[in-house]
């Protein structure tokens, strides 16, 4: 919205300060502060309201960690509503709303947030850990993801040097190579977005565990978006130039700000859980940003923590079905370490460290070739 004001009045020279709004870095900073303020401001009242409405709070897995059943019982869920409020307000206020990349990632974030909310509502009202049918949810996730990818393919500005880049997969290190999937990119892009959403959903099992790694990934991809959306920087780093995608940095800033605001209430011991409302929305957002910037493969590195959590579940289920035995004491893998005797805070902080290191490795691939 404010970028529109800049476009309307900056040329007149009557309000010189509006010229600051042409800088994506300036608007990204404002998006961080705005989103954080919104979440912190609404947090206390929203949590009290959720406690009154939900009563027993989020159901805790009876077969899970014993102390969780005792310590976390009664904690309300759906805190993702707070995250979405800050994220969407920060994005809509400070980004260029004529940019199709912005609307694509907003569609995924809001759509997945709504799906997660429906899932959380079912769990709370039925007091069960099973929500909406997995197949139905997966189908809706795929539909929303393909709609977002279609927006990018149809409406985004085509790179002048490589117009086919909008439907292509690029590779880290091997920067000069890309594979044009044509309309098959709809399926590939949807796979990345759906996979990222559910990977973050698996990770969200301890206080603050998913929030910080998502912010780290958002910071990394915010930098990537700014670089590949700038012709000078992308040319220097020999990255594929993606015109217009730099605006995604503002969205990433709002994501970081909303995450910081939520962490104020989600730090151990959590006063509220983000629930599927938050984890699906945040994971989908990260996946959509990876698709928009054409750095989908790098997400496996930057989001390596989420990949590890997902693989631990897949391996555990597959091995148990085949042999009747478990490889991990409990999956996802963060619960395995709890079963080994690690405290919750130890698991969370060490996983944060891993997320930081993986993000740095992922960013390092921008320079390697």
UniProtKB/Swiss-Prot annotation:
The chain crosses the membrane at residues 30-50, 74-94, 97-117, 136-156, 177-197, 208-228, 244-264, 272-292, 297-317, 346-366. GO terms for molecular function: metal ion binding; phospho-N-acetylmuramoyl-pentapeptide-transferase activity; UDP-N-acetylmuramoyl-L-alanyl-D-glutamyl-meso-2,6-diaminopimelyl-D-alanyl-D-alanine:undecaprenyl-phosphate transferase activity. It catalyses: UDP-N-acetyl-alpha-D-muramoyl-L-alanyl-gamma-D-glutamyl-meso-2,6-diaminopimeloyl-D-alanyl-D-alanine + di-trans,octa-cis-undecaprenyl phosphate = di-trans,octa-cis-undecaprenyl diphospho-N-acetyl-alpha-D-muramoyl-L-alanyl-D-glutamyl-meso-2,6-diaminopimeloyl-D-alanyl-D-alanine + UMP. Its EC number is 2.7.8.13. Its cofactor is Mg(2+). GO terms for biological process: cell division; cell wall organization; peptidoglycan biosynthetic process; regulation of cell shape. Pfam families: Glycos_transf_4, MraY_sig1. Its main location: membrane. Keywords: Cell cycle, Cell division, Cell inner membrane, Cell membrane, Cell shape, Cell wall biogenesis/degradation, Magnesium, Membrane, Metal-binding, Peptidoglycan synthesis, Transferase, Transmembrane, Transmembrane helix. InterPro entries: Glycosyl_transferase_4, PNAcMuramoyl-5peptid_Trfase, PNAcMuramoyl-5peptid_Trfase_CS. It comes from the Bacteria. It is found in: Cell inner membrane. It is a multi-pass membrane protein. One of its GO terms (cellular component) is plasma membrane. Pathway: Cell wall biogenesis; peptidoglycan biosynthesis. The keyword Iron does not apply. HAMAP family: MraY. Belongs to the glycosyltransferase 4 family. MraY subfamily. Catalyzes the initial step of the lipid cycle reactions in the biosynthesis of the cell wall peptidoglycan: transfers peptidoglycan precursor phospho-MurNAc-pentapeptide from UDP-MurNAc-pentapeptide onto the lipid carrier undecaprenyl phosphate, yielding undecaprenyl-pyrophosphoryl-MurNAc-pentapeptide, known as lipid I. This is Phospho-N-acetylmuramoyl-pentapeptide-transferase. It comes from Phenylobacterium zucineum (strain HLK1).
């Amino acid at each position: 919205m404010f970028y529109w004001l800049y476009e309307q009045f900056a040329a007149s020279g009557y309000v010189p300060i509006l010229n600051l709004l042409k800088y994506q870095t300036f608007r990204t900073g404002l998006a961080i502060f705005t989103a954080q303020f919104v979440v912190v401001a609404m947090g206390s009242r929203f949590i009290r309201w959720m406690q009154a409405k939900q009563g027993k709070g989020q159901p805790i897995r009876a077969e899970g960690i014993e102390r969780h059943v005792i310590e976390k019982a009664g904690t309300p869920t759906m805190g993702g509503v707070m995250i979405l409020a800050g994220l969407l307000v920060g994005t809509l206020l400070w980004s260029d709303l004529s940019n199709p990349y912005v609307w694509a990632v907003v569609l995924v974030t809001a759509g997945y947030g709504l799906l997660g909310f429906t899932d959380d509502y079912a769990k709370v009202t039925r007091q069960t850990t099973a929500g909406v049918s997995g197949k139905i949810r997966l189908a809706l996730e795929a539909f929303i993801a393909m709609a977002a990818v279609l927006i990018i393919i149809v409406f985004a500005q085509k790179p002048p040097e490589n117009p086919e880049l909008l439907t292509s997969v690029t590779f880290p290190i091997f920067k000069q190579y890309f594979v044009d999937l044509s309309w098959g990119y709809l399926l590939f892009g949807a796979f990345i977005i759906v996979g990222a959403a559910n990977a973050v959903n698996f990770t969200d099992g301890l206080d603050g565990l998913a929030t910080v790694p998502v912010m780290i990934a958002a910071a990394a991809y915010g930098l990537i978006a700014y670089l590949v959306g700038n012709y000078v920087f992308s040319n220097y780093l020999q990255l594929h130039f993606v015109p217009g995608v730099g605006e995604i940095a503002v969205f990433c800033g709002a994501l970081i700000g909303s995450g910081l605001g939520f962490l104020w209430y989600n730090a151990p011991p959590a006063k509220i859980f983000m629930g599927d409302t938050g984890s699906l929305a945040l994971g989908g957002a990260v996946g959509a940003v990876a698709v928009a910037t054409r750095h989908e493969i790098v997400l496996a590195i930057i989001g390596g923590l989420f990949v590890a959590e997902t693989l631990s579940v897949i391996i555990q289920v597959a091995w148990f079905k085949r042999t009747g035995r478990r490889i991990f004491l409990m999956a996802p893998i963060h619960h395995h370490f709890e079963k080994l005797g690690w405290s919750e805070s130890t698991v969370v902080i060490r996983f944060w460290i891993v997320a930081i290191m993986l993000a740095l490795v992922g960013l390092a691939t921008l320079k390697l070739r």
